């Protein structure tokens, strides 16, 4: 069944609450959103969220509004100004495009919306073309850019890669651009799987070097005997990461590595402790805008 219309939710927040709101949206599985600076009040930002009608009945929309209010209340910001409107699929397809532009990530990559021409000054970059459809995911979010910046340090020639929580497929595409021979992508949202496959085909013309799986990682591991990976990319919420660290370790070959992102600064120490307990050696820790990326290795 296809999406035929969208709910658009708009509300304002103080600019310093941006990170916690993004974290909450990610926790709730919402990836189609944007934040807009207000010209008349630069201390505030407008949050725009797009929700496909098939996945968001009235009961879930009410719960979402309540969850957002709770986060704002805890941070001493109160608002009742939640605006809901219904937009048609065609209008949605154009409404969020104005928030997109070419996005430089790290030293080598440029993320380019597929409807834009490549600027001349970026001709020397590795270009990842993205058409997000219903699954947003660009290099602009700190969790993604941290992961991409770490990924470009690796020599991936002929390596076997697993991408957990693929979203729009940007990490899977980057891994293939950096030389991976085969990329395996997992997401529990069929919209994300469709987006990953579509964007991979947009960049490489076919899906010969991509294998996708729909479902939960911990269930798919045993069902499909996923193992012997050289590198695993895991850009998902820390609360989910905590429960799958042993399975991730089992999927790695000896000396294989894993890049974790989606971790808040406040969650870093707990994640590192769990990684150490699973005999995963910490090789690198980086941070950006309150988010942390951890690279660990299976030594024995």
Swiss-Prot record:
GO terms for cellular component: cytoplasm. PANTHER family: ELECTRON TRANSFER FLAVOPROTEIN BETA SUBUNIT LYSINE METHYLTRANSFERASE (PTHR43648:SF1). This is Ribosomal protein L11 methyltransferase. SUPFAM superfamilies: S-adenosyl-L-methionine-dependent methyltransferases. Its EC number is 2.1.1.-. One of its GO terms (molecular function) is protein-lysine N-methyltransferase activity. Keywords: Cytoplasm, Methyltransferase, S-adenosyl-L-methionine, Transferase. Its main location: cytoplasm. It catalyses: L-lysyl-[protein] + 3 S-adenosyl-L-methionine = N(6),N(6),N(6)-trimethyl-L-lysyl-[protein] + 3 S-adenosyl-L-homocysteine + 3 H(+). GO terms for biological process: methylation. It is found in: Cytoplasm. The gene is prmA. Transmembrane segments: none annotated. It comes from Prochlorococcus marinus (strain MIT 9515). S-adenosyl-L-methionine binds at residues 144, 165, 187, 235. Belongs to the methyltransferase superfamily. PrmA family. It is an enzyme of class 2 (transferase). Methylates ribosomal protein L11.
């Amino acid at each position: 069944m296809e999406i035929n219309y969208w709910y658009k939710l708009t509300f304002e927040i103080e600019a310093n609450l941006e990170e916690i709101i993004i974290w909450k949206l990610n926790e709730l599985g919402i990836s189609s959103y944007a934040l807009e600076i207000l010209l008349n009040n630069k201390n505030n930002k407008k949050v725009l969220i797009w929700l496909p009608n098939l996945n968001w009945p009235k009961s879930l929309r009410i719960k979402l509004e309540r969850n957002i209010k709770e986060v704002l209340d805890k941070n001493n910001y109160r608002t009742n100004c939640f605006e809901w409107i219904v937009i048609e699929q065609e209008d949605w397809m154009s409404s969020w495009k104005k928030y997109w532009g070419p996005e430089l990530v790290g030293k080598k990559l440029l993320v380019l919306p597929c409807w834009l021409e490549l600027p001349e000054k970026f001709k020397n970059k590795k270009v990842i073309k993205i058409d997000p459809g219903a699954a947003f995911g660009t290099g602009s979010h700190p969790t993604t850019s941290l992961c991409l910046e770490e990924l470009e340090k690796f020599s991936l020639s002929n390596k076997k890669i697993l991408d957990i929580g693929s979203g729009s497929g940007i990490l899977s595409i980057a891994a293939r651009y950096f030389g991976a021979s085969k990329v395996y992508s997992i997401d529990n949202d069929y919209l994300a799987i469709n987006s990953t496959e579509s964007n991979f085909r947009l960049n490489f013309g076919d899906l010969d070097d991509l294998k996708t799986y729909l479902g939960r990682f911990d269930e798919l591991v045993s069902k499909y005997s996923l193992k012997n990976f050289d590198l695993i990319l895991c850009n998902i919420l820390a609360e989910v990461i905590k429960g799958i660290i042993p399975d991730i370790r089992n999927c790695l070959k000896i000396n294989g590595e894993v890049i974790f992102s989606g971790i808040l600064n406040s969650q870093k120490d707990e994640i590192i402790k769990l990684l150490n307990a699973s005999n995963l050696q910490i090789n690198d820790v980086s941070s950006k805008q309150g988010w942390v990326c951890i690279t660990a290795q299976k030594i024995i």
